[in-house]
Regions:
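Inter-lobe coupling/hinge segments of SF2-like helicase ATPases
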Residues: 1-172, 176-180, 184-185
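Short, intrinsically disordered low-complexity segments
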Residues: 188-191
Length: 191
């Protein structure tokens, strides 16, 4: 029974260690890989069977070939599905597909469990059925309706200053100036 109780690999590793006291739990994240060779040490320990459960961030999905993965669990996938970016569904599908590709590569078939409050979400349905083409057709239709790339071009301007108030005022002034020329095509500022 997976319930959202906190965030981060450290918290998840602690919970798993308590639930499965005999399991050797390892972490694969920035905090556990402080030295350059820690990356390889952790992966080698997992492949040698010195780590039973490896808790990691998105780094694990990125083209790393690890043998003997029988189960991948994605907690709180809703966060991944609802990033405020027009590409979030495409990116979520890609990341979840990469993770799915990590399991059951050489031995027996693996299992992927995804925690979600929206099991009927279009990204999860496409992942389950393998219908990437259908997902992208829907995405392209939505992008056209809402005026997102590739149907328009977006430009993001970051305004930075050591004094947050100065940055806020400057970004509002800039947005006002741009609106005079471009009208409602200007979104923001987001402060």
């Amino acid at each position: 029974d997976l319930r959202l109780k906190g965030t981060g690999t450290e918290k998840l590793a602690e919970e798993l260690s308590q639930l499965f006291p005999k399991a050797r739990v390892g972490r694969f994240d920035q905090q556990s890989m402080r030295k350059r060779d820690d990356f390889q040490k952790i992966l080698m320990a997992f492949e040698r069977g010195e780590i039973d459960v490896l808790v990691g961030t998105q780094l694990l999905a990125k083209g790393i070939d690890i043998e003997n993965i029988g189960l991948v669990v994605v907690p709180d996938s809703d966060m991944l599905l609802h990033i405020p970016d027009f590409r979030s569904h495409e990116r979520a599908f890609q990341q979840l597909q990469q993770l799915a590709g990590r399991i059951g590569r050489r031995a027996e078939r693996g299992v992927m469990m995804i925690q979600t409050y929206q099991p009927e979400h279009e990204v999860l349905k496409a992942l389950k059925t393998g219908d990437y083409k259908g997902l992208m057709e829907t995405e392209m239709e939505q992008r056209e309706v809402f005026g997102y790339p590739p149907f328009t071009k977006l430009l993001k301007i970051d305004v930075k200053h050591l004094d947050a108030q100065v940055a806020t005022e400057a970004s509002r002034w800039l947005a006002d100036q741009l609106r005079k020329q471009l009208g409602n095509l200007v979104l923001g500022p987001q402060v």
